[in-house]
């Protein structure tokens, strides 16, 4: 039913949808949702931080940036067997996807990347969808991940191109788009979304949805995060997002990207079950489960399963939309590492609150 998908949404059109009376917005979103998806099925993904902290970037929301003092303990890359154990646990808890996150600016060819490729092979062989979020990557690196059996690659746009400059100064918005472009040259699906509650306007939220919805095909998954303001980060003072904003954002995302999995991501601990149920009604059909999301608290998986039971919802099986990728063993790989790293722009502007948080961390 992809004939309903439109790739030329304008910012004004999206703002008009977002601002509709809530009952109309919910009705429209729920109608589209039911045409494309089973409303009682929700995908459960588990996020694993395979390498935490110590990142050289300055993202204003992020407790893993080395320059901010947030109490995050940096650690080394997890071993393949540790990851396998976590994936098996996730599978037994109803997850159909494992997303592995490394706090890297970009992928570097070498031992650590080889280890990540082995993790991808291992999880794909457990018959689970594998997703990675490892920062920027080259086309060759994307090909090697695809060959290992990667199902999805996550690279969030975070916000609109305009507001991006107030969040991050160590790379540009166009660098995000380039990595997504590199992933799309392979058969790996794209997962890309953003964060609300960073001080952005509704125009910025719409701008982010323009950037995502004009991709063709549209992303397979779009995570919608509510900022969790962490002490020590530049955004520690931001007020929590109201549940109505989350519901509107989910509904609007569903309307402009009918076939996408819309994922409730960070910030669910601050949402009541009623609030989450309204998000599911509005078109959210994916959640992150597990005790924490990288470094942020998350509801207990048993609580989530109880909520599903209350709502009469079931967890989605893996590989419903796209067939399971085949895994090619390292020895049979068609792609040699090129020893290259992604190029990125250095925008050169400064962000006052990021600098202040960085100075404060040294005191």
From Swiss-Prot:
The keyword Membrane does not apply. [2Fe-2S] cluster binds at residues 99, 131, 191, 263. CDD domains: Radical_SAM (cd01335). The keyword NADP does not apply. Catalyzes the conversion of dethiobiotin (DTB) to biotin by the insertion of a sulfur atom into dethiobiotin via a radical-based mechanism. PANTHER family: BIOTIN SYNTHASE (PTHR22976), BIOTIN SYNTHASE, MITOCHONDRIAL (PTHR22976:SF2). This is Biotin synthase. The gene is bioB.
């Amino acid at each position: 039913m992809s004939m309903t998908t439109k790739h030329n949404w304008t910012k004004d059109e999206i703002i008009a949808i977002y601002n509709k009376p809530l009952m109309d917005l919910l009705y429209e979103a729920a109608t589209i949702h039911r045409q494309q998806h089973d409303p009682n099925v929700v995908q459960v993904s588990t996020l694993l931080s395979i390498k935490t902290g110590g990142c050289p970037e300055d993202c204003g929301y992020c407790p893993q940036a080395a320059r901010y003092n947030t109490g995050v303990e940096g650690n080394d890359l997890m071993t393949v067997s540790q990851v396998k154990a976590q994936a098996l646990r996730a599978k037994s808890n109803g997850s159909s996807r494992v997303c592995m996150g490394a706090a890297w600016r970009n992928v570097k060819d070498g031992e650590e990347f080889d280890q990540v490729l082995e993790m991808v092979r291992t999880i794909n062989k457990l018959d689970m969808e594998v997703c990675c979020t490892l920062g920027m990557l080259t086309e060759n690196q994307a090909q090697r991940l695809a060959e290992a059996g990667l199902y999805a690659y996550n690279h969030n746009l975070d916000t609109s191109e305009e507001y991006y400059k107030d969040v991050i100064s160590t790379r540009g918005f166009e660098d995000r788009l380039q990595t997504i472009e590199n992933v799309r040259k392979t058969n790996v699906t794209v997962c890309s979304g953003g964060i609300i509650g960073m001080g952005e306007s509704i125009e910025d939220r719409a701008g982010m949805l323009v950037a995502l919805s004009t991709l063709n095909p549209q992303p397979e998954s779009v995570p919608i995060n509510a900022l969790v303001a962490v002490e020590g980060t530049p955004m520690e003072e931001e007020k929590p997002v109201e549940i109505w904003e989350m519901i509107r954002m989910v509904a609007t995302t569903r309307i402009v990207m009918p076939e996408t999995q819309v994922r409730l991501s960070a910030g669910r601990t601050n949402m009541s079950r009623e609030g989450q149920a309204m998000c599911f009604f509005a078109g959210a059909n994916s959640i992150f489960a597990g005790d924490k999301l990288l470094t942020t608290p998350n509801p207990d998986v048993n609580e989530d399963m109880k909520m599903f039971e209350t709502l009469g919802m079931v967890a989605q099986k893996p590989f419903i939309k796209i067939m399971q990728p085949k895994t090619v063993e390292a020895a049979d790989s068609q792609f040699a590492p090129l020893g290259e790293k992604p190029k990125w722009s250095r925008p050169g502007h400064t962000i006052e609150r990021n600098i202040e948080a960085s100075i404060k961390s040294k005191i």
